[in-house]
């Protein structure tokens, strides 16, 4: 199998694993963010609100209700993650041929011969990783935005969609602008998120490989998982307000949620600064876990396939 084929397969497996395992986090986050907070007491803890939403979901749809929207999530995430990780790896490999972005960072020490076993990915400077992550994420996000809209609306309880094809047909009939709804907010969230994630992931992984030399595949997988979880936590908190804005635009139908700036103003008027962090704990939990699972599966899969060929 070619390198690109290996990357697509590993990326697809990564997307499948994270989506199936963590869909309840996504659904609860969407339900929490879709509201305007008018039914919540200002001092009410988020944990209590999340528990109420969870009970409502289980009451109306049983435990399976927590996995509502899994199909559109898979439709978006499996090819999306495969395309993103493959494109990111290919772009980084291309950028690594440039003296402006190729990483020269190296810390020689005893056992240095094993240092490359922690990763099979191209090495770039921090600036290169930032640009590669942001550029790739926005490009893939543009292609898959229609599925993001579909996923958000399927997870929401505002729309009574009975089938995936029926939901997609309704969105298509509403016009091209509906297919790209929320793309600006998504880009403002995803570009810095992906850029920061790759920078911190590679940086933490580089340093961790000297604390725990990845002599075995198990140690390498542990480094990948912990590095990705840490990077995911940092990048998530830095970009969460744009996630709230994106969800409002894609799910709410009122006029005040049709534009990026008007949505920002509406959230501020109704909730203040706290409104921009609705669902932050859920997104943080999901991103930390999905980053750890996703990148451990991706890099581990690549290392396994390359050592077996």
Swiss-Prot record:
InterPro entries: Hem25/SLC25A38 (IPR030847), Mit_carrier (IPR002067), Mitochondrial_sb/sol_carrier (IPR018108), Mt_carrier_dom_sf (IPR023395). Solcar repeats lie at residues 2-94, 124-207, 219-304. The keyword Hydrolase does not apply. It holds the Pfam family Mito_carr. GO terms for cellular component: mitochondrial inner membrane. It catalyses: glycine(in) = glycine(out). Gene3D superfamilies: Mitochondrial carrier domain (1.50.40.10). Its main location: mitochondrion. It is found in: Mitochondrion inner membrane. The chain crosses the membrane at residues 8-33, 69-95, 130-155, 182-205, 223-249, 279-297. The keyword Transport applies. PROSITE patterns: SOLCAR. GO terms for molecular function: glycine transmembrane transporter activity. Keywords: Membrane, Mitochondrion, Mitochondrion inner membrane, Repeat, Transmembrane, Transmembrane helix, Transport. It is a multi-pass membrane protein. One of its GO terms (biological process) is glycine import into mitochondrion. It comes from the Eukaryota. Mitochondrial glycine transporter that imports glycine into the mitochondrial matrix. Plays an important role in providing glycine for the first enzymatic step in heme biosynthesis, the condensation of glycine with succinyl-CoA to produce 5-aminolevulinate (ALA) in the mitochondrial matrix. Belongs to the mitochondrial carrier (TC 2.A.29) family. SLC25A38 subfamily. HAMAP family: SLC25A38 (MF_03064). This is Mitochondrial glycine transporter. It comes from Laccaria bicolor (strain S238N-H82 / ATCC MYA-4686) (Bicoloured deceiver). The lineage of its organism: Eukaryota, Fungi, Dikarya, Basidiomycota, Agaricomycotina.
């Amino acid at each position: 199998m070619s390198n690109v084929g290996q990357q697509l397969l590993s990326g697809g497996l990564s997307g499948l694993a994270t989506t199936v395992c963590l869909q309840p986090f996504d659904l609860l986050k969407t339900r929490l963010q879709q509201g305007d907070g008018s039914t919540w007491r200002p001092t009410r803890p988020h944990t209590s609100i999340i528990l109420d939403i969870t009970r409502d979901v289980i009451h109306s749809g049983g435990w399976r209700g927590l996995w509502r929207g899994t199909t559109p999530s898979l439709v978006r995430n499996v090819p999306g993650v495969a395309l993103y990780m493959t494109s990111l790896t290919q772009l980084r490999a291309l950028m690594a041929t440039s003296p402006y972005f190729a990483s020269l960072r190296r810390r020689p020490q005893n056992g240095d011969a094993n240092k490359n076993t922690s990763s099979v990915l191209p090495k770039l400077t921090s600036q290169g990783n930032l640009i590669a992550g942001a550029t790739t994420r926005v490009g893939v996000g543009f292609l898959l935005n229609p599925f993001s809209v579909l996923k958000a609306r399927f997870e929401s309880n505002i729309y009574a969609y009975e089938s995936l094809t029926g939901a997609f047909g309704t969105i298509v009939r509403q016009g091209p602008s509906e297919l790209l709804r929320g793309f600006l907010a998504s880009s403002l969230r995803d570009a810095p998120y992906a850029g920061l994630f790759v920078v911190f992931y590679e940086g933490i992984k580089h340093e961790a490989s000297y604390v725990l030399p990845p002599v075995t595949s198990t140690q390498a997988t542990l480094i990948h998982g912990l590095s990705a979880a840490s990077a995911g936590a940092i990048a998530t908190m830095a970009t969460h307000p744009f996630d709230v804005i994106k969800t409002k635009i894609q799910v709410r139908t009122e006029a005040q949620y049709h534009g990026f700036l008007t949505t920002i103003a509406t959230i501020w008027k109704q909730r203040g600064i706290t409104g921009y962090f609705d669902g932050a704990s859920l997104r943080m939990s999901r991103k930390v876990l999905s980053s750890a699972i996703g990148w451990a599966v991706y890099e581990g899969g690549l290392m396994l396939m390359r050592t077996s060929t």
